[in-house]
């Protein structure tokens, strides 16, 4: 399977799916303010003379061998582009509101990864009761954004809100064993993304990411279900719905 091949390359060949080349991309899609902020936080001065070198070295861009043009990597688009959906439409969070409150039933969130998390939180605050533990859903979205399988080009992160449950569905299962039977830590996926997000995130949402599952369960007294589906090749977080919080202050 494609995902297993990607996992094998990442494990044995020091290959990151995030640094794979996006042939039909344009370097002008990169938001240079985010790039400058990233290098500034690393203590590196970026200017016109070293810009291309630093971006290539960091895996944000590459030089097309045939045309000599600068183009974007997958990770470069995910982290540093506000309009990456033009090249990677799978980078999307779809929030479905089944509460029937007259608000937009489906909200589509796109952009660079950190902005997508912020936009999703804003949408959730408009949909959910004020006393609902929104932070738990945002934590699940954080994990989905960081660890989803970005090589799944026909699937997106889905958040479905109803009175009975709230579901966060992320493409790519939590692989525990590779094709040879060797155990793999879920947190090893997308390490390139992790480094970039940790560096850029002013809210420090990813610094203590290993405790994410605990932070998701705690507000609901552990009444949360995690489903790692090999058949569907996805990871689901199922939280309580809104009915327990309706009418409460």
Please tell me what each predicted stretch does:
Residues 28-31, 86, 176-249:
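Flexible, glycine-/charge-rich segments associated with ATP-binding catalytic modules
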Residues 1-152, 157-166, 174-179, 183-188, ...:
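Active-site helix-to-loop segments that bind/position phosphate- or nucleotide-bearing substrates
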Residues 166-171, 239:
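Conserved DxG motif in ATP/Mg2+-binding regions
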């Amino acid at each position: 399977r494609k995902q297993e091949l990607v996992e094998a390359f990442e494990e044995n060949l020091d290959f990151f799916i995030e640094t794979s080349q996006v042939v039909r991309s344009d370097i002008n899609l990169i938001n240079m303010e985010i790039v400058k902020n990233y290098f500034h936080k690393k203590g590196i001065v970026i200017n016109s003379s070293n810009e291309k070198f630093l971006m290539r070295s960091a895996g944000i861009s590459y030089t097309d061998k045939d045309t000599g043009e600068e183009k974007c990597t997958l990770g470069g688009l995910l982290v540093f582009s506000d309009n990456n959906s033009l090249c990677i439409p799978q980078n999307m969070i779809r929030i479905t509101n089944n509460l029937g409150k007259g608000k937009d039933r489906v909200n589509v969130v796109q952009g660079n990864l950190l902005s997508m998390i912020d936009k999703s939180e804003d949408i959730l605050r408009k949909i959910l009761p004020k006393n609902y533990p929104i932070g738990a859903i945002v934590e699940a979205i954080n994990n989905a954004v960081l660890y989803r399988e970005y090589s799944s080009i026909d699937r997106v992160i889905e958040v479905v809100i109803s009175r009975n449950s709230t579901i966060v569905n992320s493409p790519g299962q939590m692989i525990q064993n590779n094709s040879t039977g060797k155990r793999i830590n879920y947190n090893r996926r997308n390490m390139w993304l992790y480094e970039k997000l940790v560096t850029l995130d002013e809210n420090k949402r990813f610094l203590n990411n290993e405790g994410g599952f605990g932070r998701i369960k705690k507000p609901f007294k552990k009444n949360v279900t995690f489903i790692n589906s090999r058949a569907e090749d996805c990871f689901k977080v199922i939280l309580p719905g809104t009915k327990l919080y309706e009418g409460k202050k």
